[in-house]
Amino acid sequence: MLHLTLEDQLFLGQPKQVGTHSTVHDHLAVMFEDDGETGYFYALDMRQNAQPIVDCLHVYNVDNTRNHHEARKLEICWDENGYLALLLINGYPHAVFDFAHLIGYNTNKHPQPDLMSMWTHEEITNERATAWLGVNTIK
């Protein structure tokens, strides 16, 4: 079961920063950022005072999207264990962090995790999206 922790409207290319903490673990958080050119999803561990960002995932380049002037629905959900955070845009998982297994999922595995981190990146597949959401979401 997923818990919706944030729901907002998104216009690609309009700067935005939003985030939420895990529903179970106060030290875990995620943040979405559109800097006007690109969208990124960040994993944060608030116990790491010097640098709480432990991983990031590319979500989109504004120039490579169609109809970026149209409003989109932005949602962040956490699983019931508080270790899996999903970034949904119009109901589709565009980026996911699995804090329990230190895996970031997106469509292009970009950018590569820092060599000193324990994180890895994998591609979002229809099977994974179905397992996370319980429905077939990626076409």
Where are the language model's segments positioned?
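Non-catalytic amphipathic alpha-helical adaptor/oligomerization segments
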Residues: 66-74
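Structural signature of eukaryotic scaffold interfaces centered on beta-propeller domains
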Residues: 2-26, 31-34, 73-80, 122-139
